[in-house]
């Protein structure tokens, strides 16, 4: 990823996070790397992580060839929804961190919705 492309992604993410902060709801944030996918649910003010899931965890790794495809994203999405609901969070704002809503990001979001989270 070139520097300019990454800076543009971070600029989009900053704008989105400012809007989510005004809404005052919990935030489901996603980080995508070349090999793995991470998801975290933050409090409304962003000061505390309520739930987290990623492709490095043993319960997600089981049965997956690698952590960089849509199948892994679906597992992470279902797991983050389960953990957020266990913590009492039903409604979240989806922070895609400046990534396009496509591929792994979309798969994670759809799986989290199926798991019971409302965006």
UniProtKB/Swiss-Prot annotation:
One of its GO terms (biological process) is translation. Part of the 50S ribosomal subunit; part of the 5S rRNA/L5/L18/L25 subcomplex. Contacts the 5S and 23S rRNAs. The lineage of its organism: Bacteria, Pseudomonadati, Pseudomonadota, Gammaproteobacteria, Lysobacterales. Belongs to the universal ribosomal protein uL18 family. It comes from Xanthomonas campestris pv. campestris (strain ATCC 33913 / DSM 3586 / NCPPB 528 / LMG 568 / P 25). GO terms for molecular function: 5S rRNA binding; structural constituent of ribosome. HAMAP family: Ribosomal_uL18_B (MF_01337_B). The gene is rplR. It comes from the Bacteria. Signal peptide: none annotated. This is Large ribosomal subunit protein uL18. This is one of the proteins that bind and probably mediate the attachment of the 5S RNA into the large ribosomal subunit, where it forms part of the central protuberance. The keyword Ribosomal protein applies. GO terms for cellular component: cytosolic large ribosomal subunit. InterPro entries: Ribosomal_uL18_bac-type (IPR004389), Ribosomal_uL18_bac/euk (IPR005484). Keywords: Ribonucleoprotein, Ribosomal protein, RNA-binding, rRNA-binding.
